[in-house]
């Protein structure tokens, strides 16, 4: 059952989200995250966050396949996606517009990974292919939603980089087990509210 969940098809989804590391004045120089974290813009909240970016690759059911923590800049996110995709040769990688770029596309082609992103230009009518891409992208968005809401990713309370890595790994393990349990009992894969504990 686990092998079926992890190795289902060639489809992989990649995205990143900012994880706040500290939010007090002077945190950039006095925190244990100094030298690792920096300021980055979070478009979903319309604010700047001092922290790191979690880059996650998941399969089409939402099971995490790999992750990396990088600085919050877009270039670092692309490098992390390339490093994570190197273990996914022969797969089709769905990403949002932030991963669009000829350099990343060419680098992924060298390791036999096809990158699929939304159309770069807004079209008057959304073609069926763009709607299908958006539906597939909802899977990774729901994974991040579960991590942030049910598993309180943004309230990790980590004081060091090692502590942050440990807390993220715990949440990803809990997410994977939740998806696995849902598959065993026939529930929707990412419906984790029953395991919330609230």
Briefly describe each language-model feature range.
Residues 6, 92, 155, 181-185:
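Residue-level signal for secondary-structure boundary elements
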Residues 9-10, 136, 143, 169:
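A generic secondary-structure signal marking the coil-to-beta-strand transition
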Residues 44-47, 157-168:
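Structural motif
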Residues 77-81, 140, 144, 170:
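A general structural signal for well-ordered alpha-helical segments in protein cores
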Residues 92, 97-163:
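Helix-centered, glycine/charged polyanion-binding patches within enzymatic domains
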Residues 166-198:
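C-terminal domain-tail junction helix/linker
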């Amino acid at each position: 059952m686990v092998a079926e969940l992890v190795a289902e098809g060639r489809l992989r989804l990649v995205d990143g989200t900012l994880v706040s590391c500290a939010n007090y004045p002077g945190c950039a120089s006095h925190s244990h995250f100094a030298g690792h974290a920096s300021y980055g813009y979070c478009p979903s909240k319309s604010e700047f966050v001092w922290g790191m970016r979690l880059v996650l690759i998941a399969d089409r059911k939402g099971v995490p396949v790999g992750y990396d923590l990088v600085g919050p800049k877009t270039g670092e996110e692309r490098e992390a996606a390339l490093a994570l995709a190197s273990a996914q040769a022969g797969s089709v990688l769905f990403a949002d517009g932030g991963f669009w770029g000829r350099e990343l596309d060419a680098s992924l082609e060298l390791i036999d990974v096809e990158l699929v992103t939304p159309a770069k230009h807004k079209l008057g009518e959304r073609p069926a292919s763009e709607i299908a891409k958006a539906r597939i992208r909802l899977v990774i968005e729901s994974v991040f939603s579960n991590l942030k809401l049910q598993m309180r990713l943004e309230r990790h309370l980590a004081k060091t980089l090692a502590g942050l890595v440990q807390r993220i790994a715990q949440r990803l393990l809990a997410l994977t087990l939740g998806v696995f349990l849902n598959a065993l009992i026939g529930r929707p894969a990412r419906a984790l509210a029953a395991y919330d504990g609230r």
